[in-house]
Amino acid sequence: MDLQSLTKEELNEMSMVEAAFIVMANKRQPFNFYDLLEEVAKLKGISETEMDERISFLYTDLNLDGRFLTLGDNTWGLRSWYPHEQAEEEITHSAKPAKRRKSGDDDGEEEYDLVDELEEDEFEDLEDELDELADEEDQDGERDDYDEKDDALPGFDEEDGQTLDEED
């Protein structure tokens, strides 16, 4: 669909996500979300206050509509531009910034740890905590859901080792 062929009435009736699709299809390039929002607002003649009220709706619609693909760093493209096999490879992921923290040394050198390593440590700590809780439960002598009667066999008297049918 061409932008010039649309009447003002058709543009007003069109949803924001449809307008975003038309803008991206005609420009044939990925857009930053806020740039796309401005293009859609310009196209539909939406005021800035109305645009601020609708920003979350457009973002939600882009996420739900299967025609759009997030490329990382708040950049959106059309899924049809990327073959299925290449889509995962070409999507850019922003580099996570390294976090700085002071080491305990007096020489003032700084250590740099990547965010991934910190997240991995947090998961290991959580895993250790869960293991400790499980061990405590295992060591706990009481089993709330266990009753010695559960082990008794029906029709068998444990005291003399005879079945109840044999007693005469």
UniProtKB/Swiss-Prot annotation:
Which InterPro entries does the record match to this protein?
A: Asxl_HARE-HTH, RNAP_delta_N_dom_sf, RpoE
The subunit field of the Swiss-Prot or TrEMBL record says:
RNAP is composed of a core of 2 alpha, a beta and a beta' subunits. The core is associated with a delta subunit and one of several sigma factors.
Keywords assigned by UniProt, alphabetized: DNA-directed RNA polymerase, Nucleotidyltransferase, Transcription, Transferase
Keyword Transferase present in the record's keywords: the answer is yes
Q: Which GO terms describe its biological process?
A: DNA-templated transcription; regulation of DNA-templated transcription
Q: Compositional bias of type Acidic residues: which residue ranges?
A: 106-168
* Descriptive protein name: Probable DNA-directed RNA polymerase subunit delta
Q: Which residues form a coiled coil?
A: none
Region (Disordered), start-end ranges: 87-168
Query: Lineage, please?
Result: Bacteria, Bacillati, Bacillota, Bacilli, Bacillales
